[in-house]
């Protein structure tokens, strides 16, 4: 995230500022971090589609086919 030091000993960032605004902008929540969440979700979705496709392929060509 940003280079600001957290006031908490374990490095947490408070969810809200004293005036009620979010402590971290929404844009930063989706684009900062070790890996962006959208990238992880895209890779996971592609993996699920691949596995489901593999099952359908196997059902037509493998032991389960008539």
Curated annotation (Swiss-Prot):
Q: Membrane topology type, per the record?
A: Single-pass membrane protein
Which cysteines pair up through disulfides? They are none
Intracellular or extracellular location(s) = Cellular thylakoid membrane
Q: Which UniProt keywords apply?
A: Membrane, Photosynthesis, Photosystem II, Reaction center, Thylakoid, Transmembrane, Transmembrane helix
Show the stretches that span the lipid bilayer: 37-57
Q: Which domain of life is it from?
A: Bacteria
Share an example GO biological-process annotation for this protein: photosynthesis
**Cross-referenced NCBIfam families:** PRK02565.1 (NF002722)
The entry's family comment says:
Belongs to the PsbJ family.
This protein's name: Photosystem II reaction center protein J
The organism's taxonomic lineage, starting at the top: Bacteria, Bacillati, Cyanobacteriota, Cyanophyceae, Synechococcales
């Amino acid at each position: 995230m940003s280079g600001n030091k957290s006031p908490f000993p374990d490095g947490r960032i408070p969810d809200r500022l004293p005036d009620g605004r979010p402590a971290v902008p929404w844009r930063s929540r989706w684009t900062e971090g070790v890996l962006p969440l959208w990238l992880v979700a895209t890779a996971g979705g592609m993996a699920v589609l691949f596995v489901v496709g593999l099952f359908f392929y196997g059902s037509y060509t493998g032991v389960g086919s008539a």
